[in-house]
C-alpha cells in the first residue's frame, strides 16, 4: 500500500513513516517544504502527483500554550489545512486518517473518553483540532480520526527524554500528580 504522510519532520510523522516502511508499505513523507497544507493548490498538486492509496495526516500546529496567542495561524494549519487535505482525498477517493487530540474534550471526564463523547474544547489548540475533525466529517466518508495524547517515541521532543535525563542527573524527579492520560508511543 502506498501511504502519504504529512508532518514527516515532526515526532509522530517521522515515526509513522518508519513504522510503515518496517511493515513493507511504500511511505511518502512530506513536510511544509514539500507541501504547505494551508495552500490548497500545493496540497492538490502534491497529493495528485503522489497518487497514494491512503493519507495519514500528522502535520499540525501543536504548541498548545503558544496557540492561545496565535489563533489564526493555528486555525489555518489545524482546521483549514486539514480541510484542504480532506477535499483532495474526497476528489481522488483516498482513505484518510486524521491525527487529533484529547484536547477536543473538556478535561472533566471521570472515565476514558469514548469516540462519540461530546467535544467541548477548552483552549485554542483543542478548538482548532475539533474544527479539523469537523472538516473531515463534512468532506469524507472514508476516514478515521485517531485522538492521541502524551506522545513519546525515539525521535523528537517529548516528556520521557527530559525525565530520563533528570533521573540520571539527580536520581529522582518531581512531577505533577493530578493528571490522567493515555500515553501514545
Segments predicted by a language model, with ranges:
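NAD(P)H-binding glycine-rich loop region in Rossmannoid oxidoreductase-like domains
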Residues: 40-77
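N-terminal Rossmann NAD(P)H-binding glycine-rich loop of SDR-like oxidoreductase domains
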Residues: 2-22
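SDR active-site strand-loop-helix element
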Residues: 6, 30, 55-59, 96-101, ...
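Adenosine-cofactor binding site in Rossmann-like domains, unifying the SAM/SAH pocket
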Residues: 21-45
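NAD(P)-dependent short-chain dehydrogenase/reductase
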Residues: 134-182
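Conserved catalytic-core motifs of eukaryotic protein kinase domains, centered on the activation segment
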Residues: 65-72, 107-111, 156-157
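NAD(P)-cofactor binding segment of oxidoreductase domains
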Residues: 55, 69-97
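Catalytic helix-loop patch of NAD(P)-dependent Rossmann-fold dehydrogenases
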Residues: 76, 81-84, 91, 104-146, ...
